[in-house]
A protein has these predicted regions:
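NTP-dependent small-molecule kinase module
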Residues: 134-204
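Conserved substrate/cofactor phosphate-moiety recognition/catalytic segment
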Residues: 22-60
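P-loop (Walker A) phosphate-binding loop of NTP-binding proteins
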Residues: 8
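Glycine-rich phosphate-binding loop used to anchor ATP phosphates in small-molecule kinases
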Residues: 49, 53-118
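Hydrophobic anchor at the beta1->P-loop junction of P-loop NTPases
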Residues: 5
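Conserved lysine of the Walker
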Residues: 13
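Post-Walker A alpha-helix
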Residues: 16-17
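A glycine- and Lys/Arg-enriched "phosphate-lid" helix/loop adjacent to the NTP-binding pocket
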Residues: 87-161
Length: 204
């Protein structure tokens, strides 16, 4: 089984992935952030490095999905391939930070990959307001994230909401991060687990 977490930068995907993997004894697959050779450069000069970064993420997540589907284990994935293609790359293109030529090349590659993969069995979307995202980003203190702009997070949030509203590829669970603290409050985590159980076992 393939469970995936989706959400904006700072929504709490990695934290919830860890907690759910521990609870269910699922195998976690994390976003390839530390190994990404383009991330620091991208936040310094988005226009120069946007295409390279997005191709790196696309390749990384495509390989990840193939690994997940060939695994006998239940896997929980931190961020999906769809977020790159539906949110981050189109946003960079709309902001003038990725050329139309590069964006069309990227979309063509994604569309080919998309014919070879399956959607997650359950997608968990972490919905968070911009103030919550900023607070979480500041708390974790990743140096390369210091230059992320408020308007950038806002644009990403708008694209996330549009994508989630039209998502029909599989089961979907929405978690309102503004209203809970699953990291520090066991009751909030328990509530999420109950909702996941209902989805997995078809008890709506």
């Amino acid at each position: 089984m393939h469970i995936a977490l989706a959400g904006n930068i700072g929504a709490g995907k990695t934290t919830l992935t860890e907690l759910l993997a521990k609870h269910y004894k699922w195998s976690p697959h994390y976003e390839d952030v530390d190994e990404n050779p383009y991330l620091n450069d991208f936040y310094e000069d988005m226009q120069r490095w946007s295409f390279n970064l997005q191709i790196y993420f696309l390749n990384s997540r495509f390989r990840q999905v193939l690994d997940i589907r060939s695994s006998a284990k239940t896997v929980i994935q931190d961020r999906t391939i769809y977020e790159d293609a539906e949110i981050f790359a189109p946003n960079l293109h709309a902001m003038g930070l990725m050329t139309t030529r590069d964006f069309n090349n990227y979309r063509s590659l994604f569309e080919m990959m998309n014919t070879l993969i399956q959607a997650p069995d359950l997608l968990i979307y972490l919905r968070a307001s911009v103030p919550t995202l900023v607070n979480q980003i500041q708390k974790r203190g990743r140096e390369y994230e210091n230059s992320i702009r408020i308007d950038y997070l806002k644009q990403l949030n708008e694209r996330y909401e549009a994508w989630i509203n039209r998502y029909k590829a599989g089961k979907l669970l929405i978690v309102d991060v503004d209203r809970m603290d699953f990291q520090n409050n066991p009751e909030d985590l328990s509530n999420i687990i109950d909702r996941i159980d209902a989805q997995i076992h078809g008890l709506f």
